[in-house]
Amino acid sequence: EAPVLVHFHGLEGDSRSHYAEALMDHCVKNGVRGVVAHFRSCGGRLNRLPRAYFAGDTADNSWVLKNVHARFPKAPFFAVGVSLGGNQLAKCLGDLGKAASFVTGAASIGAPLDLVAGTEIMTRGANIFYGKMFLSTLKKKAEEKARLFPDIIDARAIRACKDLYDFDNVYTAPIHGFRSGMDYW
């Protein structure tokens, strides 16, 4: 049976990200069934809940891995995560422990293991452009969610965010049950 590879993209990525497309093209050319899992509100559709996704959130990853494996139970099964997706994948497999024994192999590429340092790096040098790009798309989605959930998401506070640190303090942390960005990181 043809092998299966599940790919978890990075922050604000999706199946159209250049690295996801390249990986899936490689899968097709080599007889591998490739799957790209979209994080909540990535891939062009806003999810219907106030929450989004964050580095330590592994429930969706676990669900994807188990459900894809259930469709191809006899196939060699691989998973790869890039950047934030690598962080989530590594944590997910650790959380699953022996329940992840169906995974033949996995790779975490460029995962931000130190979120404090990673967020800080996005505020200086050439990385500031990435930080601003991520912040722009994250804010847009959070503002859309604020229109849907005005009692729990403060659109004005979202608009006032100047960097990822602000965003994690105003949205990511509180909406996912953390006291602050630092508590989340």
Which residue stretches match the model-derived regions?
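Short beta-strand element of the alpha/beta-hydrolase
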Residues: 2-10
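Alpha/beta-hydrolase-fold enzymes
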Residues: 72-176
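Catalytic nucleophile-loop/oxyanion-hole region of alpha/beta-hydrolase
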Residues: 40-78
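Conserved alpha/beta-hydrolase
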Residues: 13-16, 24-48
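Short, hydrophobic alpha-helix immediately C-terminal to the catalytic nucleophile
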Residues: 21-25, 62, 66, 90-94
